[in-house]
């Protein structure tokens, strides 16, 4: 049996509505796996089946019956389902958002007592078997938790849920045990490949949920005796040197940027899970963190003068397949409420493109793209731009940043226009409008990045110039 299988290495951000300037809830994540592994974007329509459906994983044969009614939802699957679906993130017709997963590790003590289940649920299946069947973030926690309790899980993971009012972070810590914490409305959390939830209040069901029998499991195996101070991270998580160079520095940088901290240690194992920002946050604050690489610190790998530039693993790196910010906006009609901001390829070298999940279709470029380069694929357009910039970052970084700024201005203006018109529409007319405008937004991004590619090719330094 595989004791621990790791499929991705991501960074996540969760933000409560009162911490955002516009009262949105936010869940966001970089999906990191391979340096060239395309993603697509799709919308699964609402469907009612006559018979109960059965899901069978192509990855590990995890099998589960599904309800007859499947709600509409968006998703970002792999270009191939040979190794599983990996739908990763989306928003459903009830305005519920889900992102899965933030890969993590459990310690040998807990896995010895409750091993991972080889054919249990894993990252590749979670969005597919949870998001289309829930009407709130809290329901998402409950459904995923019940699946893990019944079928087990083959991995240690963190999962993000949100709706108009609540943001939840879910963590599985062993084969059948899990906890989840609601992010306070005025707070945020940054997570980076470690079990992150700290003190669990077992008597506060409004803000904590957990698996049946977890108290007995922990007590009977002598993992914890003080349940008034039950620390999930300490009991179930790891505390290794690799955590201190791979994981905690990313949390440190996120908190440094969002809270203005200057006195925390990037290698500390005691960084708090829940934090308050030093200002009301905006979407571009979240985008900045997800695209960051320790800027303005001694650890920035893009600054050749930094002796410690490669000491820590950065948040944005070449293995990022896509990055998403799932924004659920307060007080909006449900079909307009959510925006799935999607950046294909490496976050630092891409742009977040808005997509309204009530749309019926996506741009053709988001439906294609395989293992080899394809200039008709959105993934490969953004990936190529990043590769060209990387080759001569010092010379080309300004051209890239100018493009990113132009795209951000165009698309933010576009969202204002779309919202204003969308609020006057309903039914199929609304969905058709959101489809047309979402595709138009995607086209703007593709046009600007193809222009960038042409510019980079034209101005690339020649061997004679670099002698």
Language model region names:
Residues 458-467:
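Single conserved hydrophobic/aromatic residue that forms the stacking wall/gate
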Residues 3-123, 143-268:
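A contiguous strand-loop segment
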Residues 133-142, 146-155, 279, 296, ...:
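Secondary-structure boundary elements
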Residues 225, 230-323, 327, 331:
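Glycine-rich, aromatic-lined ligand/substrate-binding cores of catalytic
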Residues 115-116, 126-133:
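Second-shell loop/turn segments in exported
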Residues 68-72, 141, 302-310:
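Short Pro/Gly-enriched beta-strand edge/turn motifs at strand-loop
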Residues 305-422:
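Substrate-recognition/cap regions that form aromatic- and gly/pro-loop-enriched pockets
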């Amino acid at each position: 049996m595989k004791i621990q299988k790791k499929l991705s290495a991501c960074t996540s951000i969760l933000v409560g509505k009162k911490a955002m300037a516009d009262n949105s809830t936010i869940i966001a994540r970089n999906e990191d796996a391979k340096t060239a592994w395309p993603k697509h974007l799709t919308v699964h329509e609402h469907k009612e089946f006559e018979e109960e459906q059965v899901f069978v994983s192509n990855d590990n044969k995890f099998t589960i019956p599904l309800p007859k009614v499947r709600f509409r939802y968006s998703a970002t699957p792999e270009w191939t389902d040979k190794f599983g679906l990996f739908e990763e993130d989306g928003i459903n017709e009830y305005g519920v958002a889900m992102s899965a997963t933030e890969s993590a590790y459990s310690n040998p003590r807990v896995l010895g007592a409750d091993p991972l289940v080889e054919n249990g649920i894993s990252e590749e299946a979670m969005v597919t078997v949870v998001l289309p069947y829930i009407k709130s973030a809290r329901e998402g926690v409950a459904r995923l938790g019940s699946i893990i309790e019944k079928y087990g899980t083959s991995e240690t993971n963190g999962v993000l849920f949100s709706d108009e009012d609540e943001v939840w972070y879910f963590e599985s810590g062993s084969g059948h045990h899990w906890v989840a914490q609601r992010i306070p409305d005025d707070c945020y959390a940054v997570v980076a490949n470690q079990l992150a939830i700290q003190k669990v209040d077992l008597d506060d069901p409004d803000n904590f949920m957990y698996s049946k029998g977890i108290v007995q499991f922990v007590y009977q195996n002598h993992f914890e005796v003080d349940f008034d101070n039950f620390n999930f991270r300490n009991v179930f998580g790891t505390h290794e040197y690799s955590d201190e160079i791979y994981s905690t520095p990313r949390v440190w940088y996120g908190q440094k940027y969002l809270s203005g901290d200057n006195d925390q240690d990037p290698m500390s194992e005691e960084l708090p899970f829940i934090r308050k920002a030093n200002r009301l946050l905006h979407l571009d604050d979240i985008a900045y963190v997800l695209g960051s690489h320790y800027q303005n610190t001694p650890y920035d790998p893009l600054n050749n003068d930094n002796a410690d530039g490669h000491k820590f693993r950065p948040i944005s790196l070449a293995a990022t397949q896509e990055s998403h910010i799932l924004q659920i906006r307060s007080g909006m009609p449900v079909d307009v409420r959510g925006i799935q901001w999607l950046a294909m390829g490496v976050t630092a070298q891409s742009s977040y493109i808005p997509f309204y999940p009530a749309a019926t279709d996506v741009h053709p470029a988001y439906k294609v793209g395989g293992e080899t380069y394809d200039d008709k694929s959105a993934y490969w357009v953004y990936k190529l731009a990043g590769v060209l910039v990387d080759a001569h970052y010092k010379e080309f970084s300004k051209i890239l940043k100018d493009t990113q700024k132009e795209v951000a201005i165009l698309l933010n203006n576009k969202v204002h226009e779309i919202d204003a018109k969308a609020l006057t529409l309903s039914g199929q007319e609304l969905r058709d409008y959101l489809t047309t405008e979402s595709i138009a937004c995607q086209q703007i991004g593709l046009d600007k990045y193809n222009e960038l590619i042409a510019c980079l090719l034209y101005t690339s330094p020649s061997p004679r110039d670099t002698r």
